[in-house]
């Protein structure tokens, strides 16, 4: 079985971003500037933001984190996002999700300048992704595609099953896998909590992308020999260990290629965030042919 090593691929992508940043500083006189908004004390969000801050330092970005009290009002949060969107000094904006109860994430995301939407969640970027126009792509699905590209695992003409229909992973993942591109062109099925006989659907798949957050949901009997599995799930077991949505240890002699958890998709999410921020920096200076 081929181990799809997200740590290795992410490290190479971060190095390319660092090289790009060095060139951009020489050309324009400053590095990309990423603004991160963290609301509340969610432990997982705190960890993710620290990882992102460290990655920014490694590639040479300027980053600033706005740490806001969980009791902040909707109007105050929207005011900050609007100010950052209009600032000439900010190239990318990341609103760390989830937000505390009482705050409307969709309203906030819609206020981010689409050209600075490095998470790819703004409705304009989502719409452009759906019709194949240049856009900033959601980081985790984009990271999955980057892994497939690196290892030459093309889903073109194959059956792909995405398990989960979230706006962050499932839906954009399905769009990227079915897109008319070298590492798209798959026939995609999206499964969710109302899908009858999930095992039967997954068993037909050549590419399996679980992103639902249920430990070891995908078992040996659900996977046909030779399938490629990219596990987006991240779950903490009672003993403190992390695992994905796939029963990894019992599938190594069934799958032809598979990501580990941790060390698979997670590092790619942060690396593609860095890549998106460089893209946003460039687009603010020279928009693509179909500008955002």
From Swiss-Prot:
InterPro entries (UniProt xref): Aminoacid_DH-like_N_sf, NAD(P)-bd_dom_sf, THF_DH/CycHdrlase, THF_DH/CycHdrlase_cat_dom, THF_DH/CycHdrlase_CS, THF_DH/CycHdrlase_NAD-bd_dom
UniProt keywords, alphabetically: Amino-acid biosynthesis, Histidine biosynthesis, Hydrolase, Methionine biosynthesis, Multifunctional enzyme, NADP, One-carbon metabolism, Oxidoreductase, Purine biosynthesis
Pfam families: THF_DHG_CYH (PF00763), THF_DHG_CYH_C (PF02882)
Keyword Kinase in record: no
GO BP annotations listed: L-histidine biosynthetic process; methionine biosynthetic process; purine nucleotide biosynthetic process; tetrahydrofolate interconversion
GO CC terms of this entry: cytosol
GO molecular function: methenyltetrahydrofolate cyclohydrolase activity; methylenetetrahydrofolate dehydrogenase (NADP+) activity
Reaction catalyzed: (6R)-5,10-methylene-5,6,7,8-tetrahydrofolate + NADP(+) = (6R)-5,10-methenyltetrahydrofolate + NADPH; (6R)-5,10-methenyltetrahydrofolate + H2O = (6R)-10-formyltetrahydrofolate + H(+)
Assigned EC number: 1.5.1.5, 3.5.4.9
NCBIfam families: PRK10792.1, PRK14184.1, PRK14186.1
Family note: Belongs to the tetrahydrofolate dehydrogenase/cyclohydrolase family.
Known partners and oligomeric status: Homodimer.
Role noted for this protein: Catalyzes the oxidation of 5,10-methylenetetrahydrofolate to 5,10-methenyltetrahydrofolate and then the hydrolysis of 5,10-methenyltetrahydrofolate to 10-formyltetrahydrofolate.
Name of the protein described by the UniProt record: Bifunctional protein FolD
Source species: Solidesulfovibrio magneticus (strain ATCC 700980 / DSM 13731 / RS-1) (Desulfovibrio magneticus)
């Amino acid at each position: 079985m081929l181990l799809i090593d997200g740590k290795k691929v992410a490290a190479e992508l971060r190095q390319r971003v660092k090289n790009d940043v060095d060139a951009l500083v020489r050309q324009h006189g400053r590095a990309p500037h990423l603004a991160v908004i963290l609301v509340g004390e969610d432990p997982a969000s705190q960890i993710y933001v620290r990882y992102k801050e460290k990655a920014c330092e490694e590639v040479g970005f300027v980053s600033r984190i706005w740490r806001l009290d969980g009791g902040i009002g909707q109007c105050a949060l929207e005011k900050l996002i609007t100010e950052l969107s209009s600032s000439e000094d900010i190239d990318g904006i990341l609103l760390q999700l989830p937000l505390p109860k009482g705050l409307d994430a969709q309203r906030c995301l819609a206020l981010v300048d689409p050209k600075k939407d490095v998470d790819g969640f703004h409705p304009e970027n989502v719409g452009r992704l759906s019709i194949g126009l240049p856009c900033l792509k959601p980081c985790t699905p984009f990271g999955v595609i980057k892994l497939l590209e690196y290892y030459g695992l093309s889903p073109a003409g194959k059956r792909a099953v995405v398990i989960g229909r979230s706006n962050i992973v499932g839906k954009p993942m399905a769009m990227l896998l079915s897109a008319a591109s070298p590492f798209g062109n798959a026939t995609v099925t999206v499964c969710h909590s109302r899908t009858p006989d999930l095992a039967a659907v997954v068993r037909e798949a050549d590419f399996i992308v679980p992103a639902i957050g249920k430990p070891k949901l995908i078992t040996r009997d659900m996977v046909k020999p030779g399938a490629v599995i990219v596990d987006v799930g991240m779950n903490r077991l009672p003993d403190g260990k992390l695992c994905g949505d796939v029963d990894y240890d019992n599938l190594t002699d069934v799958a032809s290629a598979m990501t580990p958890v941790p060390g698979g998709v997670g590092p790619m999410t942060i690396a593609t965030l860095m890549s998106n921020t460089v893209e946003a920096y460039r687009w603010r200076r020279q928009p693509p042919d179909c500008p955002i």
